[in-house]
C-alpha cells in the first residue's frame, strides 16, 4: 500500500496532488539485539522484552497505559490475528525453478531510475528459500493466520495454461501451505498482488486488454490452477489486492509497473492516458474477479471456502464544516472504496463516478452485472491512515489530469488549522488516526450491508535511506509501530461493539521487504530483515508484543469456517 508519488509526477501544484507532499515538499511512498547473524539454521532472534518495559514513554512515544493495552480475550476465540506479505515483495528467486518474468521484474530491470534507490526484488527478503524460518516466526508469535500471495508467473511462466504449468512453482506453494497448517496457521491466499506475467503485458497489454476477454480468461484459468492445486487446504481466498491502487499507479501516475501515464507527465512510458486507462484496467479486474468467483462457486463450493477481494481505503474527513467539503469527502470515498466495492454490491460504479467520468467509465452488460453482484462472502480492508478532503468547483478552470481527479476534491494532509490529522508515523504519508478505521467499518455496516470483514493490512513504514539511514537498534525498538498496532486493535474492539462484522486482523508486514517504487527505503516489517547479513530475521518490539498478545490468556483456538 502506498500513496501517489507526487514528486515523480512534477505536479506539486496540482490541487489533488498537494496532499502527497510533506510540509517541505518532500516526496514519499507508502509498509534482544544481536551483533552478528544467527546460524543459517536459525536466522531469527526471539529474545524477550518484559511487558513492563513497553509502557510509559519509549523513544518519545507515549504508549498506552497497562489498562488500555488491548488483550486477546477481548475478541472471540475464532477471531483471526496474523501477518501479511506479497510474493514479489518477499520471495526473491525471480528467475529460479522455472519462474517467468513479471511486470515488476521487467520494470525494475529496465527502469531502475524509477525506483527510489534503484533496487529490485530479485532477492527480496529471500523468503522463497527461507519460508521455513518465516513459518517458525509466525508460530513463535502465536499467529492464527498468514496472508500471502501466489506469483502468477511462478505458476504460469508465460501467463497462460497453454504456455505450461510450472510444477516447481506449484510444489513451492504446497510446501508452504502444508507447513503452515502443520503449525496450526491458517493460510489466507491472495491470487493477484500486482505481479502480471510480462508475457501477457507484451501479448495484449495485460489488464489493458481492450477485448475484455483475453486477460479475464487468462486470469480465470490461473485462478483455476490455484483452486485445483491448493483448494483442498486453502479455505480463504482474495482474488485481487487493492485494485484501486494497482490501476491508478500502474496506468495513472505510472509509478507502478508497467509505468504508463499520459504524455507530459513524468513516468517510464508517457504514451498512455491517465484519465482512461485506469478505468479500462479496473473494469477488466472486476470482470476477472466475477469470473473467478463464479468458477469457485460452481465447482469448488464443496471445499467450504470463503472468497472475496481486498480494498485499500484511506479514511476521509471533511476539510472544513461546509456542506461542499462533506460532499467532497463522499466523492473521494466513492473513488477510493466505491469504485470496486459498489459493482460487487449493486452491479455498477458509484453515481458520482458515472456523473463525472462519463464516457471514460466502461459499462457492464446485464450478464456481467449478474455475476458481479454478491461475488464475495468476505472482504478485506487495508487501512493505514486518513486524510482531509476539500471541495473543488466543477468548472472549465479545473481540468482533471488523473482518473482520481474525478472526485473533484483535493486530498489535504493538513487541516485548516495547519495541523495534520494525527501524529506522524515515520514515513511522511501515514498519520495516526485509528478513528478512520472505525469510520470505514461503520460505512461497511450502514451502507454496504455489513459483510464479513478482515483487516488484511495495517501498519507503518520506517524510513531507511542513504541520506537518512536507520540504525538496526532503532529499527528493532519500533515503539511507534507498537503503539500504532495497539491503538488500531483497540479501535477494532470498539467497532465490533458497535456492530461491525469484523473477523480478523493482519499486520503489514511480517517482514521488511521491497516496497514497490520506494525500493528498500522503507521498512514495514514487524520482523527486521538484515539484508547485509544473510537476510537474518530479528523480531522487533512490535512482534514481541504481538507474541505476548497472542499467547496470554488466549481463548481456546477455533479456526473460522464459513457460515
From Swiss-Prot:
Gene Ontology CC annotations of this record: chloroplast
Signal peptide from the UniProt entry: none
Major localization listed first in the record, in broad terms: plastid
UniProt-annotated catalytic positions: 242 (proton donor), 457 (nucleophile)
Localisation: Plastid, Chloroplast
Tissue note: Expressed in leaves only starting at day 6 after germination.
Positions contributing to a beta-D-glucoside binding: 89, 193, 241-242, 384, 457, 508, 515-516, 524
Superkingdom: Eukaryota
Annotated organelle transit peptide span: 1-51
GO MF annotation list: beta-glucosidase activity; DIMBOA glucoside beta-D-glucosidase activity
Region Disordered: start-end pairs: 17-43
Enzyme Commission identifier(s): 3.2.1.182, 3.2.1.21
Catalytic activity reported: Hydrolysis of terminal, non-reducing beta-D-glucosyl residues with release of beta-D-glucose; DIMBOA beta-D-glucoside + H2O = DIMBOA + D-glucose; DIBOA beta-D-glucoside + H2O = DIBOA + D-glucose
Family annotation (PROSITE patterns): GLYCOSYL_HYDROL_F1_1, GLYCOSYL_HYDROL_F1_2
Assigned keywords, A-Z: Chloroplast, Disulfide bond, Glycosidase, Hydrolase, Plastid, Transit peptide
Pfam families: Glyco_hydro_1
Biological process terms in GO annotation: carbohydrate metabolic process
Subunit structure: Homo- and heterodimer.
PANTHER family: 4-HYDROXY-7-METHOXY-3-OXO-3,4-DIHYDRO-2H-1,4-BENZOXAZIN-2-YL GLUCOSIDE BETA-D-GLUCOSIDASE 1, CHLOROPLASTIC, GLYCOSYL HYDROLASE
Family: Belongs to the glycosyl hydrolase 1 family.
Protein name, as recorded: 4-hydroxy-7-methoxy-3-oxo-3,4-dihydro-2H-1,4-benzoxazin-2-yl glucoside beta-D-glucosidase 2, chloroplastic
Originating species: Zea mays (Maize)
